[in-house]
Each structure stands twice: as C-alpha cells, then as structure tokens.
A protein has these predicted regions:
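A short glycine-rich, Lys/Arg-flanked "PGG" loop and its adjoining helix->strand segment in the class I
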Residues: 255-267
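Core SAM-dependent methyltransferase catalytic element
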Residues: 329-350
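A short acidic, leucine-rich amphipathic alpha-helix
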Residues: 50-53
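Short amphipathic alpha-helical interaction segments
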Residues: 57-68
C-alpha cells in the first residue's frame, strides 16, 4: 500500500507531541513535590539560578525543568529578561491547591498508571483483572485529588441543586450514604455545607477508609460523618439520599450495588450517580476527554470490575448502560439531572 507522506508527517507530529507530554507529566509531579510552581507563583519571574536557590535544587535541573515547562506552555519565558514566570491562568491550575482547576493531582493519578504497566499488560494477556488495592499507591491519592477539584467546583453549586428537592432536605437534615467514598472528599464537602445532615461513607478499601476518617477529623466534621469498610452490595443502614461518585462503573457487581442502594433508601429517597461524561456511541467519545477516560478505563476501571467478576462497564459506559444498571436494582425513575464537560450527573428514584 502507498503511504501518504502528508498524513504520515501529521501522525508523526502528533506522536512527538504525545511523547513530550508523556515525559512532561513526570516533571509536573516533580514541580509540585519540590515547590517549583509555588516558588514561581510567589516570587514572580525567576531565572534558573534564582529558582534553584529558592527551592534548593541543582541549577542544571532547574534550567532543564524550566525550559521543558516553557516549551509546553505551562510557564512563560521573557527572553529579554531571561526569566520564567507563571501567568495567572497557570497559577490557578498549577500553584493554587484550593483552585477548582488545580491539576497536579490529576497528573499524579495518570502517571501512576504508567507505573503499573506490567500489571496492565499481564491483565490484558491473561484476561484477568487488577484489584483496586493492587495498584501503585500514587493512584489512590492522585485520583482523590483529581476528583476533589471537580467536586469543589460543582457539587454544591450545580450538581445537588439539579436534583429534585434534595438541597432543601439536606439543609433541614437527612441521612446520607456515600457508596464507594474513597478518601471521603465528596462526603466531607457535603458535610461542611449541610451541617444538619448525617453522612456515612462506605468503601471496600481499608486504607482509603482510614484516610477518610482522618480527613474528616482534620476538617472538623467527625460529629456528622463516619466511614466504614464495606462492600457496595452489603452495607447497612436506612437513608434518605444515596450518592456514588465516579465509582459505579468500577464495581465488580454494579447491579448488586444498585439493588442494595434501592433496599437502603426510604420510599421518597433519591440516588445521585456521578459518572464521567460519555455518549452511548464510542465515536462521539473520540475527543481529548474521551481519550483520557478510555485510557483510565483500560488501565484501572475495567480491570477493577473484572477482578470482581463484573461486567467491566468502563469509564465511558454512557447513559443507556448506566440506566440499565440502575433500573436493574428496582429504580423506576432515571434521568440526566445535569452535566459538565467532565461529568454526567444522574438522578434515580424508587
């Protein structure tokens, strides 16, 4: 077959860009851990000698790091002054840990997937799964930080108000269960905003529950939040409102989880399901966000589900498949409540 040289060069250009992005992901994590972005944000324009002095690293490393970041557009370079700086937009994404657009946690989580390449290759080859607890430890912290920024930006201001009557009930005081709570960021955000309500978070990963419990104490919400180790199919209690954040598609038994949530809800209860944004048609997911989620799905989400003998819904399951799971649990009402570029928020009722 004849190769179209123009198309070949276009593809090679894309691949080179991806190679640069791959290695730069490591340097984003390095930059956060060593306070390099923070130094630029606090001090203004710096050259490599000044950055090295402020952060205690070798100047040669500072020089290479600065130019990698400038080449990728993550920082800016003033050639006349020979200094590097963080524009305000990049400050919000790389130096402000409380910003809803803060990114280094995302890089930490996705970089952890590369550290598990041998496990992923084995899972592919041997048609087996990878349990959540068998991944590199950076995944747990990175995923929580990745999700937390989205929850801070949207959960209270957008997602909960999109549900039928839930916000008012939360302010009055109800019982809430957060299934698959991980490190508890979603649970704690809700507990801070709705102090009259009581919250319980369940997760089958003991280390995550230990972390969540400590973070609830640190946040001063332990009086209304508790965390327990439990599988999504057999947790205890009766609730007015249930939530599952970015976890249903990972589960080994999502249908069983839906049945247990249905069983645990009161007759007038409601279930909010937060899932990665996805269309039912794979072709419509062939974009930068879909690419990111399919990558996470192939390395983490589907292997996690398969490890539990699950259906492997994946991070791009789409509304129809999620709806089928929800309805299999006994729910009669299911709708898209709202959406963002990164998430779809569903509401289900008995």
């Amino acid at each position: 077959m004849t190769i179209d040289d123009t198309k070949l060069q276009e593809f090679l250009g894309k691949a080179v860009s991806d190679l640069g992005a791959t290695v730069s992901s490591t340097l984003v994590v390095v930059g956060e851990k060593l306070g390099l972005y923070q130094a630029l944000a606090e001090s203004g324009p710096l050259n490599s000698h000044e950055l090295a002095e402020k952060t205690g690293i070798l100047e040669r490393y500072a020089f290479e790091w600065l130019n990698n970041q400038a080449a990728g557009g993550y920082i800016a370079y003033d050639s006349k002054a020979n200094k590097y700086y963080l524009p305000e937009e990049q400050k919000a994404c790389l130096a402000d840990k409380d910003s809803p657009t803060y990114l280094p946690g995302s890089f930490q989580s996705f970089l952890s997937m590369a550290k598990d390449e041998e496990k992923v290759t084995k899972a592919f080859k041997e048609k087996q799964g990878i349990h959540w607890g068998d991944h590199h430890c950076d995944l747990y912290e990175g995923v929580e930080r990745f999700f937390r920024t989205k929850y801070l930006a949207n959960l209270i201001s957008n997602w909960i108000p999109s549900l039928d009557g839930i916000e008012e009930k939360l302010r009055d005081g109800i019982h809430v269960v957060d299934v698959g709570c991980g490190h508890g960021s979603s649970t704690i955000i809700m507990a801070k905003e709705y102090p009259n309500s009581k919250f319980v978070g369940f997760d089958y990963h003991p280390e995550s529950i230990k972390t969540a419990t400590q973070r609830a104490q640190d946040a001063g919400v332990s009086d209304r939040v508790s965390f327990e180790v439990s599988d999504s199919t057999n947790f205890s209690g009766s609730y007015d409102f249930a939530t599952v954040f970015d976890a249903l598609h990972d589960m080994g038994n999502p249908h069983g989880a839906a049945k247990q949530i249905y069983k645990s809800l009161k007759k007038d209860g409601s279930w909010m399901i937060v899932e990665p944004f996805s269309s039912d048609k794979p072709r419509e997911n062939h974009n930068p966000i879909g690419r990111m989620f399919y990558g996470a799905s192939a390395t983490v989400c589907v292997p996690c589900s398969i490890a539990g003998n699950g259906p492997g819904l994946g991070a791009q399951a789409g509304p129809t498949r999620i709806g089928d799971v929800v309805k299999s649990g006994g729910f009669t009402k299911f709708r898209v409540a709202t959406q963002t570029p990164m998430n779809i928020i569903y509401e289900a009722n008995p």
